[in-house]
């Protein structure tokens, strides 16, 4: 089922949102990743690589670099790890990513309409 080794943009949004929800509802990081793997929601190879990084003592932010989150998002995660409220930060990142996606879609609609009229 999972052939790609990278998550799509939508999968990254869903992943960070669901992880934030699980953490907010009392799951530990280990429990959340076990849930993701058992439910087969995301590519197991990616999740296992992140899990392995965490077991080796790497920070969550450093582990997320392989998931292609932006440097700004990784910085937010790093600060949340240091100062607390990781769950809320992850939910905020998901909302920000959704907003950017909506703006991108609206921009493409606005640009494509005049081009359609010219053709």
Predicted region positions:
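Catalytic metal-binding core of the metallo-beta-lactamase
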Residues: 1-116
């Amino acid at each position: 089922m999972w052939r790609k080794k990278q998550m799509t943009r939508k999968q990254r949004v869903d992943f960070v949102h669901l992880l934030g929800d699980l953490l907010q509802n009392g799951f530990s990081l280990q429990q959340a990743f076990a849930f993701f793997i058992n439910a087969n929601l995301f590519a197991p190879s990616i999740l296992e690589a992140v899990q392995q990084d965490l077991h080796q003592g790497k920070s969550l932010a450093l582990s997320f670099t392989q998931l292609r989150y932006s440097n700004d998002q990784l910085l937010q995660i790093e600060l949340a790890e240091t100062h607390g409220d990781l769950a809320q930060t992850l939910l905020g990142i998901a909302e920000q990513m959704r907003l950017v996606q909506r703006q991108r879609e609206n921009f493409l609609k606005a640009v494509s309409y005049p081009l359609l009229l010219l053709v």
